[in-house]
């Protein structure tokens, strides 16, 4: 054991579980199960499990893209890696993390010696304590950890029960007494029902021996998470273990740790100056015409200096009025191409009261991915609940009875780790918020349920009679008119328009493009809404600072009375600013909007991109396409038709010529000869 006063007793007098190797496994998870509060549980992060030595330096790591608390890989660090910069016993106290295995290598015996080798690989092992500083010592360590009478054992650290105070601390590798071990590879097979990990060898002794002879790390461990370890929520504070070798004499040991780090896959949005009130864009003024340059006369040849034209600047962002008009204009274009009879004369009104957007449940074909795609990192959190969704569509998960009216088809997720990605132009509306991607692991672990929806702005449709009636002076009370929203008129355009485009051709394709323009206008409006809320939050923070300054002044004035609270005879009068939650949510919303914009642009094909880049390209193609097609048909079939026509004329002419020639001659009658 770790204490020099604790010596090994005969096997018939003590519990054989008394011999353990100290291994400290520090499993620190950056963020407990409540990490990233308010985010979608299906959001994918870049997760990295790092194994550290006793000094908390990373010596081994593995990374992957998964939702939080769904990825528990097997950790396979080498035992000697954990000893880097560790206790002097292992011979690696001066080796930095991620260092290559130190030499010299062992000799190859009868097959020949290697340059710089120290000892024969086939030499019988002595009773020297195994170390990691040479290939021969690592071979000795391999045989010690694999033999039936040897091995190693692991003792838990800070998360052990309080009654196990006799197990000691890091100086004894948490194995100061027998009975503290919970896992390892020893002949008594230590185990536990509450510990968070199990540790074993990852290679057989024959496999490890050959790797050791090649002067490499040859003692990999296999660390697996138990069911208890996958359920704990205290990884942020870290958990430690100790590992000790089971050898004769004092058991050597070491300490190491494992921590989990995660980071968002989305882009980092820069934060710049943001005014309290967004400026409204005025109508652009026409650019003044450039003054004509005077031509140099023959008598005056002084050269004139021509100032270079200013470099083109990026157009300013659209103001509030322009954004709202873009929403209405996009709604009109989409409605005009899908239902042209309804746009002969109508009024489209943008609703100014919340909710500003509504969802339409649709049926669509989602894609199944075994690995997390890029759009799974865009975790949207718009204030869209299932109560604001209409229609019937595709549902996934355990849908409660109160929301089953939204489901036309309900699917159950199977077991396994895979991802369900919504089609382009749609989102999954879950009870935890909007998300473009679902994790089957999260759905199976929780009671989450989702509906496939389209997102539409709240634009109402009115016939002209409704608007005219508002200005007529009538004393008759009319019935409340029925308002049709854009979602009811165009619901399902994303899935229906794309499917119809395959069979109907150009019309459906243009309709889909108009929907994409409306979708882009919706994204721009959501960005401006986010900026407006951010401005409001900053204004509230500024007001809070003024309030706190006034409060401090009042406390000084009422200092003799015991402060402002005592003067007002109030028990407590503290001020708490909760705008930090708003600031965090707005930063996440800004990041998700940027990610969704990139995903929308990347989903467009090269053919659609040509129409979007050049506004005059569509008009040019539609104008010259007809004449070009006619000219192409003439060039393809014209020579054949012309040859047929010429041959027909030649045949008719030859017939006429034959008739003319036959009219100029008469048939001679045969002469009869009389016999003489």
From Swiss-Prot:
Q: Where is the lipid attached (S-palmitoyl cysteine)?
A: 640
Residues in compartment: Extracellular: 35-620
Q: Which residues form the signal peptide?
A: 1-34
Record's compositionally biased regions (Low complexity) = 294-308
> Where do the segments described as Receptor-binding domain (RBD) lie?
35-270
Q: Where is this motif: CXXC?
A: 346-349
User: Can you summarize the PTM annotation of this record?
Assistant: Specific enzymatic cleavages in vivo yield mature proteins. Envelope glycoproteins are synthesized as an inactive precursor that is N-glycosylated and processed likely by host cell furin or by a furin-like protease in the Golgi to yield the mature SU and TM proteins. The cleavage site between SU and TM requires the minimal sequence [KR]-X-[KR]-R. The R-peptide is released from the C-terminus of the cytoplasmic tail of the TM protein upon particle formation as a result of proteolytic cleavage by the viral protease. Cleavage of this peptide is required for TM to become fusogenic. The CXXC motif is highly conserved across a broad range of retroviral envelope proteins. It is thought to participate in the formation of a labile disulfide bond possibly with the CX6CC motif present in the transmembrane protein. Isomerization of the intersubunit disulfide bond to an SU intrachain disulfide bond is thought to occur upon receptor recognition in order to allow membrane fusion.
Residue sites binding Zn(2+) per the record? 89, 120
Q: SUPFAM superfamilies recorded for this chain? A: ENV polyprotein, receptor-binding domain, Virus ectodomain
| Keywords, ordered alphabetically | Cleavage on pair of basic residues, Coiled coil, Disulfide bond, Fusion of virus membrane with host cell membrane, Fusion of virus membrane with host membrane, Glycoprotein, Host cell membrane, Host membrane, Host-virus interaction, Lipoprotein, Membrane, Metal-binding, Palmitate, Signal, Transmembrane, Transmembrane helix, Viral attachment to host cell, Viral envelope protein, Viral penetration into host cytoplasm, Virion, Virus entry into host cell, Zinc
* Motif CX6CC, residue range(s) on this chain: 565-573
Any coiled-coil regions, as ranges: 513-547
User: Tell me, what is an example of a GO biological process annotation in this record?
Assistant: symbiont entry into host cell
Q: Name one GO cellular component term.
A: membrane
Q: Which residues lie on this side of the membrane: Cytoplasmic?
A: 642-676
User: Which residues are modified by glycosylation?
Assistant: 46, 202, 336, 368, 375, 408, 444
Q: Where is this site: Cleavage?
A: 479-480, 659-660
Region (Disordered) spans which residues?
A: 287-322
Describe the protein's quaternary organization and the partners it interacts with: The mature envelope protein (Env) consists of a trimer of SU-TM heterodimers attached by a labile interchain disulfide bond.
Its function?
A: The surface protein (SU) attaches the virus to the host cell by binding to its receptor. This interaction triggers the refolding of the transmembrane protein (TM) and is thought to activate its fusogenic potential by unmasking its fusion peptide. Fusion occurs at the host cell plasma membrane.
The misc remark on file is:
The surface protein appears to be responsible for the neuropathogenicity of PVC-211 MuLV.
Question: Know the name of this protein?
Answer: Envelope glycoprotein
Q: What is the lineage of its organism?
A: Viruses, Riboviria, Pararnavirae, Artverviricota, Revtraviricetes
């Amino acid at each position: 054991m770790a204490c020099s006063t604790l010596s090994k007793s005969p096997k018939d007098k003590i519990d054989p579980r008394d011999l353990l190797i100290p291994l400290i496994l520090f499993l620190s998870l950056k963020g407990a199960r409540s990490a990233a509060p308010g985010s979608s549980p299906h959001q994918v992060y870049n997760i990295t499990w790092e194994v550290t030595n006793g000094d908390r330096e990373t010596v081994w790591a593995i990374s992957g893209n998964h939702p939080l608390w769904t990825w528990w890989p097997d950790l396979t660090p080498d035992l000697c890696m954990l000893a880097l910069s560790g206790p002097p016993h292992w011979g690696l106290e001066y080796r930095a993390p991620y260092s290559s295995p130190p030499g010299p290598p062992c000799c190859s015996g009868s097959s020949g010696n290697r340059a710089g080798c120290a000892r024969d690989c086939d030499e019988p092992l002595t009773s020297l304590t195994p170390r990691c500083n040479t290939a021969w010592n690592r071979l000795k360590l391999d045989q010690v950890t694999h033999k039936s009478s040897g091995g190693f054992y692991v003792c838990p650290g800070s998360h052990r029960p309080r009654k196990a105070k006799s197990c000691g601390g890091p100086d004894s590798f948490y194995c100061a007494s027998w009975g503290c071990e919970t896992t390892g590879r020893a002949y008594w097979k230590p185990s536990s029902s509450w510990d968070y990990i199990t540790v074993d060898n990852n290679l057989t002794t024959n496999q490890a021996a050959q790797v050791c002879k090649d002067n490499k790390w040859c003692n990999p461990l296999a660390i697996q998470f138990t069911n208890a370890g996958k359920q704990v929520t205290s990884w942020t504070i870290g958990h430690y273990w100790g590992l000790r070798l089971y050898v004769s004499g004092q058991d050597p040991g070491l300490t190491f740790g494992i921590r989990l780090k995660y980071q968002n896959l989305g882009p980092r949005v820069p934060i710049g100056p943001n005014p309290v009130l967004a400026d409204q864009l005025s109508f652009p003024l026409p650019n003044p015409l450039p003054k004509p340059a005077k031509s140099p006369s023959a008598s005056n040849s002084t050269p004139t200096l021509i100032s270079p034209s200013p470099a083109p600047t990026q157009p300013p962002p659209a103001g509030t009025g322009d954004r709202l008009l873009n929403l209405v204009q996009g709604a009109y274009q989409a409605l005009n191409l899908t239902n042209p009879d309804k746009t002969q004369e109508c009024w489209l009104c943008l609703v100014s009261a919340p909710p500003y957007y509504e969802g339409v449940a649709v049926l669509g074909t989602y894609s199944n991915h075994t690995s997390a795609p890029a759009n799974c990192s865009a975790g949207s959190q718009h204030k869209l609940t299932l109560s604001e969704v209409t229609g019937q569509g595709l549902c996934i998960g355990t849908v409660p009875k109160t929301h089953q009216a939204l489901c036309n088809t309900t699917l159950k997720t199977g077991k396994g780790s895979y991802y369900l990605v919504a089609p382009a132009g749609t989102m999954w509306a879950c009870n935890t918020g909007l998300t473009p991607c679902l994790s089957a692991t999260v759905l199976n672990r929780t009671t989450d349920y989702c509906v496939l929806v389209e997102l539409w702005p709240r634009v109402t449709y009115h016939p002209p009679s409704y608007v005219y009636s508002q200005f007529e002076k009538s004393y008759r009370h009319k019935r409340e008119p029925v308002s049709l929203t854009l979602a009811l008129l165009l619901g399902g355009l994303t899935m229906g328009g794309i499917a119809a485009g395959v069979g109907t051709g150009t019309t459906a394709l243009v309709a889909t493009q108009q929907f994409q323009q409306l979708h882009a206008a919706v994204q721009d409006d959501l960005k401006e809404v986010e900026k407006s809320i951010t401005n409001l939050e900053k204004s509230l923070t500024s007001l809070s600072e003024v309030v706190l300054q006034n409060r401090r002044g009042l406390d000084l004035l009422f200092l003799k009375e015991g402060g402002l609270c005592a003067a007002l005879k109030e028990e407590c009068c503290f001020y708490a600013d909760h705008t930090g939650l708003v600031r965090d949510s707005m930063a996440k919303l800004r990041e998700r909007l940027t990610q969704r914009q990139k995903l929308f642009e990347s989903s467009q094909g090269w053919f659609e991109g040509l129409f979007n880049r050049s506004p005059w390209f569509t008009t040019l193609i539609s104008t010259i396409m007809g004449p070009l097609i006619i000219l192409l048909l003439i060039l393809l079939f014209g020579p054949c038709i012309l040859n047929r026509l010429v041959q027909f004329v030649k045949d008719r002419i030859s017939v006429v010529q034959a008739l003319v020639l036959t009219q100029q001659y008469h048939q001679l009658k045969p002469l009869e000869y009389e016999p003489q």
